[in-house]
């Protein structure tokens, strides 16, 4: 964890809880290692704070995340950046039923063929959708996990990782802006 320990150690005192939470989610054993590090990579790319992305990518490499899994996690962040905006917009529109009846007409082949186990990819989509606040996408990907027998604590762990990565990223970005 050295790259992430360095990141945690660099957080200001007001973010001590966040630094401790980072250590906790790194040590988490509920997810497989690829699932966990894919959640970190997808979440980092969703927030896109360069220093955090670099630290998480280095930690994922050190933990042995396979290159194809890393690319799929980045792909989850990319496709959810598109889908979360589209489906969240429809969900908050007053006349959303009219729009729900229309085909999205957006390519999203990576969702059906991510190149990694579906459970892993859906977890990464849950993490990114939590960051981006898309309830419909959270429901869709969490529902897919449940339909395959994945326990709720697994999705919860992905959301915890996403929450911590988001918080670390906001602190790092805020401190850089204030400097």
Language model segments and positions:
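Hydrophobic alpha-helical segments
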Residues: 1-179
């Amino acid at each position: 964890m050295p790259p992430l320990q360095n990141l945690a150690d660099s957080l200001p005192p007001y973010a001590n809880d966040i630094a401790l939470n980072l250590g906790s989610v790194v040590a988490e054993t509920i997810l497989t290692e690829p699932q966990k590090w894919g959640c970190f990579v997808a979440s980092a790319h969703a927030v896109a704070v360069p220093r955090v992305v670099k630290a998480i990518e280095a930690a994922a490499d050190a933990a042995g995340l396979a290159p194809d899994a890393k690319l799929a996690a980045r792909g989850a962040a990319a496709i959810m950046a598109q889908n979360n905006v589209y489906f969240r917009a429809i969900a908050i529109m007053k006349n959303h039923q009219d729009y729900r009846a229309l085909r999205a007409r957006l390519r999203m082949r990576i969702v059906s063929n991510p190149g990694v186990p579906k459970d892993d990819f859906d977890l990464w989509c849950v993490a990114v959708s939590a960051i981006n606040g898309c309830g419909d996408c959270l429901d869709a990907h969490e529902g897919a996990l449940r339909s395959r027998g994945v326990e709720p604590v697994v999705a919860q762990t992905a959301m915890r990782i996403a929450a911590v990565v988001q918080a670390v990223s906001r602190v790092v970005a805020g401190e850089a802006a204030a400097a």
